[in-house]
C-alpha cells in the first residue's frame, strides 16, 4: 500500500497489525501487507450468493478469504468439490480468523503466476480436483485452458473468475481477446496490478469504517 508522509500517522493509527512499514520512495511511504495472498488459490468451503448477502457488509471481505461465493446454479454443479460453509463459521469473522484464512489460502496457492501478452499463465498442484480462484474481473473476452484443453470459466465472488482443475499438477492459461479489441485487452491486463492494490486498500477501508 502507498500513502504520503502527511497521511502516514492517520494510516498507522487505523491500520490493523497486518500492515508493516516497508520503505519510502519518491515522496511516498510504502507498507507491506503481511496477509498477502498470491494470485490463484483454492478454497475448502463455499457459500451461496444468498448467504453472502446476509453477512454484515463490514465482514464480507473477511468471508471472501474463507469461502468461495457461488450462484445457486453453480453451487449445484461445483459444490461437490468443496464443503458448504457451516453456520458457525459464517459468524467467526474476526481479524485473527482472517489472518489464519490468509495463511490457509497461501498454502493452497499457485506455484507460478505470470502475466503475458495474451493474458496470464499459472501452475498449481492439487491433491484433489478443485476450483482455482483468480481475483481477476470476469470478462467474456477470456478463454481458459487447463492442461491445454478449453474449460468453462465460473463466475464467482460477485464478478471474479475460477476454473476447475483435476488432481495433480495443472497448467492454466487465460487468453483474452474481446472481438479483436487489442486496446481493451491491454487495458484489462494493465489493470491487474491496480486491482490487487485496490483490493488490499478496500479491505483496510472496510476495517477502518467498522472501528469508527
Question: What are these model-derived regions, one by one?
Answer:
Residues 1-105, 127, 137, 147:
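Extracytoplasmic
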Residues 83-212:
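Active-site-proximal, structured, solvent-exposed surfaces of multi-pass membrane proteins
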